Regions:
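Metal-ion/cofactor- or nucleotide/acyl-coenzyme-handling active-site neighborhoods
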Residues: 1-250
């Protein structure tokens, strides 16, 4: 039986360590981008974002302007609807939770693990969500993994999920920025994006993330493509090198 693998891209600096040959291989695989990964000029099959104005708007803008065939998922933990710039509302394949009626509804529940009283236990949430909903645990990573399982993944490979208080991939090195980021660098005409997110990734408490991954690992095989990821060093997940199309001959 063929096992389905989905690759999930975050924004850690290890994204810059992926080789051209590995990117070529990844273009043939099923992929999910989330958070600010859209700043990388790489088309994923699916994209997940939640909350705020700048992040989902920037992702939608990038998907549309590059004519990517990407299905866009939005999750909402706020009372107010997520705002995606009107220019792009009707141009992307999009599912959105708890918001407007111009797209399909993809219902879900998201909360942060450091809240005093999570509304449900992990067991209850998984039973309610893993077939047809999304949930998050301490941010977007768990929602992206949950999305992968909804899409039928037996195995998830994490790329750019470093959790080592390093930099974002787009703050260092040459990463071939997207059209959106090039415009952002030139001072976007969309005022809130002029000085948007660009700083070191800091995790004051990674335990909710590691605890969540330990639990979800009971249901899906999770590995990391970065040997220096905190998740690998703490033994939460195993390291697995990203393949290429080249045949290695010893």
């Amino acid at each position: 039986m063929n096992m389905k693998t989905i690759y999930i891209f975050g924004t850690g600096e290890s994204i810059n360590n992926i080789t051209d040959e590995q990117w070529d291989f990844l273009r043939t695989q099923e992929t999910i981008g989330f958070s600010w990964f859209f700043k990388k000029n790489f088309e994923t099959n699916y994209y997940y974002s939640h909350e705020g104005d700048e992040q989902p708007w920037g992702a939608a803008k990038t998907i549309c302007e590059n004519k990517w065939n990407t299905e866009f998922f939005l999750g909402n933990t706020c009372q107010e609807p997520i705002k995606v710039h009107n220019e792009y509302k009707d141009k992307i394949k999009c599912r959105i939770s708890n918001t407007s009626d111009w797209v399909q509804t993809f219902k879900g529940m998201v909360w942060y693990a450091d809240s005093p009283e999570p509304p449900l236990s992990f067991d209850e949430v998984w039973a309610k969500t893993h077939q047809d909903k999304l949930f998050g645990f301490r941010g977007q990573l768990m929602a992206a993994i949950n999305l992968a399982t909804v899409l039928g993944a037996d195995k998830v490979v994490l790329l750019g999920i470093d959790l080592n208080n390093g930099q974002h991939f787009y703050d260092i090195g040459n990463h071939n920025p997207s059209t959106f980021e090039k415009k952002l660098i030139q001072a976007s005409d969309y005022e809130p994006l002029k000085h948007t997110h660009s700083s070191n990734i800091t995790f004051n408490n990674v335990r909710p993330v590691t605890d969540g991954l330990k639990w979800v690992s009971n249901f899906v095989n999770i590995v990391s493509g970065n040997p220096d990821s905190l998740l690998v060093k703490q033994g939460i997940v195993k390291y697995e090198e990203v393949k290429t199309h080249k045949i290695n001959i010893n």
